[in-house]
Amino acid sequence: MEANHQRNDLGLVALTMLAQYHNISLNPEEIKHKFDLDGKGLSLTSWLLAAKSLALKAKHIKKEISRLHLVNLPALVWQDNGKHFLLVKVDTDNNRYLTYNLEQDAPQILSQDEFEACYQGQLILVTSRASVVGQLAKFDFTWFIPAVIKYRKIFLETLIVSIFLQIFALITPLFFQVVMDKVLVHRGFSTLNIITVALAIVIIFEIVLSGLRTYVFSHSTSRIDVELGAKLFRHLLSLPISYFENRRVGDTVARVRELDQIRNFLTGQALTSVLDLLFSFIFFAVMWYYSPKLTLVILGSLPCYILWSIFISPILRRRLDDKFARSADNQAFLVESVTAINMIKAMAVAPQMTDTWDKQLASYVSSSFRVTVLATIGQQGVQLIQKTVMVINLWLGAHLVISGDLSIGQLIAFNMLSGQVIAPVIRLAQLWQDFQQVGISVTRLGDVLNSPTEQYQGKLSLPEIKGDISFKNIRFRYKPDAPTILNNVNLEIRQGEVIGIVGRSGSGKSTLTKLLQRFYIPENGQVLIDGHDLALADPNWLRRQIGVVLQDNVLLNRSIRENIALSDPGMPMERVIYAAKLAGAHDFISELREGYNTIVGEQGAGLSGGQRQRIAIARALVNNPKILIFDEATSALDYQSEHIIMQNMQKICQGRTVILIAHRLSTVKNADRIIVMEKGEIVEQGKHHELLQNSNGLYSYLHQLQLN
């Protein structure tokens, strides 16, 4: 009745869903009590005030349909008649709108005409304060500005060295001018010797300072690289489970590898070329002093370089995008193939996999070749402009020398100075491909670094949990347009109780435990431990006190001891051995040559499936968690290993709340209570013998199937 009453106020329903989307928990009744004073539902003003009270940033705007694709979604479409709904996604290519019908509690895809019929032009944009801060700290090229400021002393030293290098570059042509116009004309050998020695000293200083600049610059950019790499890995491990479940492993790895492109760019010549380019104004002043006409030729060539780059850049970027997409596909396919090598060999499908690889590799090589061809065309275009300018300057300079407006020494000095000006321009033009590639890399890496992490700040780190668990009115789906996985689930689990959960595949058993670990926030309802809402709890605090054993567990390429004591490497050996004995793993570990120091191999490849499972159980028990989850934990064990664990089950369960998820009913028959699930709902619960008394029940049906 309460749910129906809340459903009548679609504004309150929308606020609840949007708050949970932003990982903010609320009590609908409390919001209704504070802001729905007349009992007629939340008005526009009260809705905005309620959102503000939840630390949400809400803004009411009027937006034309043609511009809806520009706003941050999901957003609330406000209707004067109270029939509000959520706008989740705008598909501009097909003119379709993914919405969420709050009345029917279901997603809907509307056509352009259908959406226009119900859209009144009013929209409420909602974001969390944390999201606003995150958007201000987005990863793009501006991310490097604080890093540059942090190492400003080093960059200032680099700038000073660059100034001296430019002074030396300015002096060298003057020496050549003196030699050509004075020494050769007057045959001044003593002056020649002095100039030669001075030039040698300048060259030595120039080489030393240039090397020093490169060293200092590379050292500072390497520090930035380390900071970025560390930030990337920390951020990657802080991302929610949903990020990894919605992306291919190879695609994520490919994005992380883009760090190499950024590293190469930072430690390359591009940034030093920019510094050299900044000093070109001084050279232009000296060149203008020599010959305004020749200087105008050089200045006239600069727009040609810029226009050529503007023409090439968009095409190059599209081809680089395509190249990255092909590379990511190859990376994903390679990771998938190596991971599934046992299946590939068992089914003898290597020829089919090879054929797919060959096609994908050919596509990547073709895409890479198109990038190379375009880059070559770009570089040759730059060379053409440079050679053309050189010919014009030679012709015009010769005329000026013949007419007496310029000496031979001045012409040579001018050409040397123009080379100092054009060289960084050409280097930058040639490095433009690298810059485009780095732009792509920053965008791809931004997909990782700009994805919101699980929020820890402001979350409650509560005292050690006791083990009381409550699921209240839980409704959950993995995606807005996906089917409902859990529907109106209510379950109370007392401290120290052993609960078995059974049901057909896809009934929502494992999803319950994922909500308990706070991998996801329910669409509706609350998950509480000891009366504390998990939406407000620190995920790390929670997960440290929950032991989980899955059907397929992953071991790291370390020793058995390190795998068991993964959460506390300094754990006493006695605790490790005790946990291994409880899990039935101590005997087989003792028989190994290296014992607990045996390296298990990548993902535990050096052990059998049953051995891996027992080590995983020991790993879950070693921290003495107050809540223990066995999700098909014994299904991969042989009967002897399962028998050992079931014998120890009383010790394992002592002093903790245990949730056993199993298809084998024999695993849960001794549980204090058995929960039977079907299509996301709890259909039966009771003890083993009580459930068998209902011959028409699902539990009896499953029990009969296993007996047969």
Swiss-Prot record:
EC number: 7.4.2.5
The ABC transporter domain, residue ranges: 469-704
Compartments where found: Cell inner membrane
GO MF annotation list: ABC-type transporter activity; ATP binding; ATP hydrolysis activity; ATPase-coupled lipid transmembrane transporter activity
Example of a GO biological process term: protein secretion by the type I secretion system
Alphabetized InterPro entries for the sequence: AAA+_ATPase, ABC1_TM_dom, ABC1_TM_sf, ABC_transporter-like_ATP-bd, ABC_transporter-like_CS, ATPase_T1SS_HlyB, P-loop_NTPase, Peptidase_C39
Residues annotated for ATP binding in this entry: G503, R504, S505, G506, S507, G508, K509, S510
Keyword Cell inner membrane: yes
UniProt topology in membrane: Multi-pass membrane protein
Catalytic activity entry: ATP + H2O + proteinSide 1 = ADP + phosphate + proteinSide 2
Primary enzyme class: translocase
Residue span(s) of domain Peptidase C39: 1-126
Domain ABC transmembrane type-1: 155-437
Domain of life: Bacteria
SMART domains: AAA
Description of how the protein assembles with itself and partners: Homodimer.
UniProt note: domains: In LktB the peptidase C39 domain, the ATP-binding domain (NBD) and the transmembrane domain (TMD) are fused.
Function: Part of the ABC transporter complex LktBD involved in leukotoxin export. Transmembrane domains (TMD) form a pore in the inner membrane and the ATP-binding domain (NBD) is responsible for energy generation.
Listed PANTHER family: ATP-BINDING CASSETTE SUB-FAMILY B (PTHR24221), BLL6336 PROTEIN (PTHR24221:SF647)
Family, per entry: Belongs to the ABC transporter superfamily. Protein-1 exporter (TC 3.A.1.109) family.
Listed name of the protein: Leukotoxin translocation ATP-binding protein LktB
Organism, as annotated: Mannheimia haemolytica (Pasteurella haemolytica)
